[in-house]
UniProtKB/Swiss-Prot annotation:
Keywords: Aminoacyl-tRNA synthetase, ATP-binding, Cytoplasm, Ligase, Nucleotide-binding, Protein biosynthesis. This is Glycine--tRNA ligase alpha subunit. Belongs to the class-II aminoacyl-tRNA synthetase family. GO terms for biological process: glycyl-tRNA aminoacylation. The gene is glyQ. Its EC number is 6.1.1.14. It comes from Thiobacillus denitrificans (strain ATCC 25259 / T1). The lineage of its organism: Bacteria, Pseudomonadati, Pseudomonadota, Betaproteobacteria, Nitrosomonadales. It holds the Pfam family tRNA-synt_2e.
Length: 312
């Protein structure tokens, strides 16, 4: 029998756990993608090695369709794998995970389609590929080049599986709501009402005045927390601001020019938080990094600090 939705998650957790990844839990806030989890966005910064895997519920208010579209949702799941430094055999590891899920690679058409990734609101970009399985995109591969405007060294490899799409292919269904979550329970049973009601909230009932005030409040608090050298709480305020922006965008409450300005404000915050986090790890001496890597980065930071002081 084809694997259930939860079987797929358990198989991926087991596979990556056996390959040295820390199996983490989802970030407990509204985020638009697994990349926004601190285990990816912040851990990609600096010289400290990191291997983690986790499921991340992802919210994109604008994509809601009141539960009427068979493959478009405002809330869905990603399975995220982060490998730093990116291993030379990352593609082979990924293909191994497909085999673990039950794909026969000799009988299925797996294609890597070049697709460099960018997230303007996080000031992040990377070189990468979409993975197409028999004509359907199921995974995004990225080698991070920058996060929060800061160069990534060593390079972090990110693998993002679209769990619903993988499951639809494995189970041979045309609608996400027909997926078997587990025996006797469908995706419709678990999430259809949520899609209907959250779509109504996102498009009709969110309070625009409140959201506009909330965005500015989160922005201000993030800035205050960075002054206090509290990078992680500051980052949470950035995530709150980003989700608030997404709700405003879904509501049609901001114009095209305002939209660009809001994205710029979030990007500036993300850049500041990235630097604040890197500084906080530097103050600790990058304790998880090989000594030579840590010393090199600390020396570069010291050099930049002296250069700024001389220019002042």
């Amino acid at each position: 029998m084809n694997p259930t939705f939860q079987d797929i998650i358990l198989t991926l957790q087991r596979y990556w756990g056996e390959r040295g990844c820390a199996l983490l839990q989802p970030y407990d806030m509204e985020v638009g993608a697994g990349t926004s989890h601190t285990a990816t966005f912040l851990r990609a910064l600096g010289p400290e090695p990191w291997k983690a895997a986790y499921v991340q519920p992802s919210r994109r208010p604008k994509d809601g369709r009141y539960g009427e579209n068979p493959n478009r949702l405002q809330h869905y799941y990603q399975f995220q794998v982060v490998l730093k430094p990116a291993p030379a055999d990352i593609l082979e590891l990924y293909l191994g995970s497909l085999e673990a899920l039950g794909f026969d690679l000799r009988k299925n058409d797996v294609r890597f389609v070049e697709d460099d990734w960018e997230n303007p609101t996080l000031g992040a970009w990377g070189l990468g590929w979409e993975v197409w399985l028999n004509g359907m995109e199921v995974t995004q591969f990225t080698y991070f080049q920058q996060v929060g405007g800061i160069d990534c060294k060593p390079i972090t490899g990110e693998i993002t599986y679209g769990l619903e799409r993988l499951a639809m292919y494995l189970q041979g269904v045309e609608s996400v709501f027909d997926l078997r979550w587990t025996d006797g329970l469908t995706y419709r049973d678990v999430y259809h009402q949520n899609e209907v009601e959250q779509s109504a909230y996102n498009f009709e009932h969110s309070d625009v005045g409140f959201l506009l005030t909330a965005f500015s409040a989160h922005e201000k608090k993030a800035q205050e927390l960075m002054v206090a050298q509290l990078a992680l709480p500051a980052y949470e305020q950035v995530l709150k601001a980003a989700h608030t922006f997404n709700l405003l965008d879904a509501r049609g409450a901001i114009s095209v020019t305002e939209r660009a300005a809001y994205i710029g404000r979030i990007r500036n915050l993300a850049r500041s938080v990235a630097k604040s986090y890197l500084d906080s790890r530097a103050r600790l001496g990058f304790p998880m990094a090989p000594r030579a890597w840590a010393d090199e980065v600390l020396a570069n930071i010291e050099k930049q600090t002296q250069k700024k002081a001389a220019a002042a």
